[in-house]
């Protein structure tokens, strides 16, 4: 399918006035400065080396939050940080508030919609989790890519069309994916992504690569134009 697109001028870490520190695909190591600034602002332990997972989403069932709630405690037994931003169903708002209360040394649950803060999180986090049950298009994985935040997604709809799994043998792919709607498949993929992200050289190279993908409306528009020419 032909994907939606994002505005590459608005979602651009080189010029974005709302991130802590600007950077490009050539200076992607500066993402680490954004991470420590975000950690400071959220009162999380300030560590460049700790893998940070972001979940920026409407808190509704079709976004895969039942999978997350099932295994997030096991994932948090690893040395990671988890930052959630979003609002929605009362049961999920309560769950993630309680998760921060229980695991406050490594979790921040910000229960609201905040576009400016979302950009700070994309610029800071190493991984974006999108375990959606259904996702007709999805823009968050494209925004994350623009900021060098590596998508971890379920293979459905627009996520399947836009994110291809990393292949360690060929070096191809622009994220980490799982296909079954299953909490333990998700956890396995998240853990694999975390392990890769502990290698700073790999992580920065991968982030630099995905930052150069053209997810703009211009790219989508050209595909539409070609399609109509063939009719």
Please report, for each region that a protein language model flagged, where it lies by residue.
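Catalytic cores of carbohydrate-active enzymes across secretory and cytosolic contexts
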Residues: 1-231
